[in-house]
Amino acid sequence: MPNKPGLWSRLVDYLGFGPEEDEFEDGELEQVQPAYQEEPPRRSAPERRGQVVPISAVPSKQGTVKVVVVEPRSFEEVQTIVDQMKARRPVILNLESLDKDLAQKILNFLNGAIYALNGETQRVSAGIFFYAPPGIDVSTMGRGLTGTAIGGGAVDLPPGVLEKLMGTASGSQEGDLLARTARRSEEGDRTGADRSKFDWRNQ
């Protein structure tokens, strides 16, 4: 005759203090592996830096640096000027003969372009500006600096411009350039013909 559980045992079981029985037998438990997989180490994206071009790419075989001189007549010519900047050619921009609105529009565009190229701009005189590509220091080039027009041909550079850029302008050369600009301004004031021209003295 099977032994009946005693009153005490039944009370303990009723209250939940009895011996716990495993619901699973040995061997029924499965080892659960984590579902994730290790990812291969990622390489950080290379840092984008401005393009650095050595200065040795500019001098020609004769040891001179070709400076492109431009006197634009329309805004459509700015693309050609920017192409010269992108090719790392120094540019002298002459805006003396343009009206105020067109000159300012061209100047703003080219200033933005040379900034994007990490170059520098320098005002030479009233209406004349110099754009240097990155890595080009005109003051260290010596006198081996010549002017050339887009498409070739002779260039009539304003007196003293290149010398002033190199820091070697004499008083007479620079004075001639400034005097010529002053004469043009005075003639425009007298005749009223050039009142629409840009006031470069405020730039």
UniProtKB/Swiss-Prot annotation:
Compositional bias (Basic and acidic residues): 39-50, 183-203
Gene Ontology CC, one term: cytoplasm
Keywords, sorted A to Z: Cell cycle, Cell division, Cytoplasm, Septation
Main localisation: cytoplasm
Localization, UniProt: Cytoplasm
Domain of life, per lineage: Bacteria
Keyword Chaperone: no
A Pfam cross-reference name: SepF
Gene Ontology biological process: division septum assembly; FtsZ-dependent cytokinesis
Start and end residues of each stretch annotated as Disordered: 26-51, 167-203
Annotated InterPro entries: Cell_div_SepF, Cell_div_SepF/SepF-rel, SepF-like_sf
Subunit architecture: Homodimer. Interacts with FtsZ.
Free-text function comment from the UniProt entry: Cell division protein that is part of the divisome complex and is recruited early to the Z-ring. Probably stimulates Z-ring formation, perhaps through the cross-linking of FtsZ protofilaments. Its function overlaps with FtsA.
Similarity remark: Belongs to the SepF family.
HAMAP family in the record: SepF
Protein name: Cell division protein SepF
Organism per entry: Symbiobacterium thermophilum (strain DSM 24528 / JCM 14929 / IAM 14863 / T)
